[in-house]
Curated annotation (Swiss-Prot):
Source species: Oceanobacillus iheyensis (strain DSM 14371 / CIP 107618 / JCM 11309 / KCTC 3954 / HTE831)
Keyword terms, alphabetized: Carbohydrate metabolism, Metal-binding, NAD, Oxidoreductase
Major enzyme class: oxidoreductase
Family according to the record: Belongs to the PdxA family. PdxA2 subfamily.
EC code(s) of this entry: 1.1.1.408
Residues the entry annotates as binding a divalent metal cation: H170, H214, H270
InterPro entries noted in UniProt: PdxA_fam (IPR005255)
Cofactor remark from the record: Binds 1 divalent metal cation per subunit.
Record's keyword annotation contains Amino-acid biosynthesis: no
Entry superkingdom: Bacteria
Keyword presence, NAD: yes
Protein name: Putative D-threonate 4-phosphate dehydrogenase
Cited function: Catalyzes the NAD-dependent oxidation and subsequent decarboxylation of D-threonate 4-phosphate to produce dihydroxyacetone phosphate (DHAP).
UniProt cross-references to PANTHER family, sorted A to Z: 4-HYDROXYTHREONINE-4-PHOSPHATE DEHYDROGENASE, D-THREONATE 4-PHOSPHATE DEHYDROGENASE
Length: 332
């Protein structure tokens, strides 16, 4: 049996930069020394990207039932779903490519559930195209949760300088505030503790953001949300032996976290967490969905329609996402 994990790489929306960042990342020989990378997508889109990038590589088309551990550097193995037309336009929202991105992910989840791959690494999809293709989800995370019957999950962003986990994600700010409950905050603190502990960090230090400016400043700002929604969750986590502090003003907490005072920050809503991490490390940032029964990592950027097909995309986030998937994946 192989000790190297099989990593399923979904191609994302092929009208974007997904095929290009996959081709560029798989030029790294070390990936093949550490794992068996398998692309799930359309081979013809990868061939087109390789031509744009002037990369000399061959392709090995597979079905889901074929042997997946015979990968080799210089030959990209692809489970070819053959959904897209050869003349798919770059940089345009397309229901066809949106549907294809969903099907790639659905196939990856099926393979993971069957034990044929040990982790999933996703290239970006376009949310508008996804929904125009008939799949009414905000993004990858929610698809993964539904198709794996997972109720409690969270998005974790990881960069070399900072890790952030979110209480709420793809909802409007007013709805996010309504969704923040002590039970949810407590669960996310637990997920942060478990995820970092499992990755080898002993007694990880967790910092929790407030909701209001200055974390409410003892009721001066807001309507007591910190006292009602966050403090009870932190108190419960402390009783469980979790090393957690807060609620703290978000600006102060992120400064202290990037300085090394905390191993991870619990953000209350999407932009509270995404803004700082993208300022500090967009190129090498990674999105990790925690709480799922399968390992999933992703790039921390979108489809970049404005540069798709031009051969200039930076692949560092995809490469780091692959490294994280390999590190987190169980071996066979």
């Amino acid at each position: 049996m192989s000790k190297k994990p099989i990593i399923g790489i979904t191609m994302g929306d092929a009208a974007g930069v997904g095929p290009e960042i996959i081709i560029k990342s798989l030029r790294n020989r070390e990936l093949y020394e550490q794992a068996h990378p398998i692309v799930i997508g359309d081979t013809k889109m990868l061939e087109r990207a390789a031509k744009i990038l002037d990369v000399d590589v061959s392709f090995d088309k597979k079905t889901k039932d074929e042997e997946l551990m015979d990968t080799e550097f210089g030959k990209i193995t692809c489970i070819d779903l053959d959904i897209l037309p050869e003349d798919l336009a770059y940089g345009e929202v397309s229901p066809v490519s949106g549907n294809a991105a969903f099907e790639y992910l659905r196939m990856a989840i099926e393979l993971a559930n069957e034990g044929k791959i040990q982790a999933i690494c996703t290239a970006p999809l376009n949310k508008e195209a996804l929904q125009k293709g008939g799949h009414m989800y905000p993004g990858h995370t929610e698809i993964l949760a539904e198709l794996t019957n997972t109720e409690e999950f969270s998005m974790m962003l990881s960069s070399p300088k900072l890790k952030v986990i979110h209480v709420t994600t793809h909802v409007g700010l007013i709805q996010a505030i309504q969704m923040i409950k002590p039970e949810r905050v407590h669960k996310v603190i637990q997920l942060a503790h478990e995820t970092l502990s499992n990755s080898g960090i002993k007694n990880p230090k967790i910092g929790v953001c407030g909701i209001n400016p200055h974390a409410g400043e003892n009721g001066l700002f807001g309507n007591g949300e910190e006292e009602e929604k966050i403090i009870p969750a932190i108190q419960q986590a402390v009783k469980e032996g979790i090393n957690v502090e807060g609620p703290l003003p978000a600006d102060t907490l992120f400064f202290r976290a990037q300085r090394g005072d905390f191993d991870i920050v619990v953000a209350m809503y999407h932009d509270q967490g995404h803004g700082p991490i993208k300022v500090l490390g967009l190129e090498a940032g990674v999105n990790i969905t925690v709480g799922l029964p399968i390992i999933r990592t992703s790039v921390d950027h979108g489809t970049a329609f404005d540069i798709a097909g031009k051969g200039i995309v930076d692949e560092r986030s995809m490469l780091e996402a692959l490294h994280q998937a390999i590190e987190l994946a169980p071996t066979k």
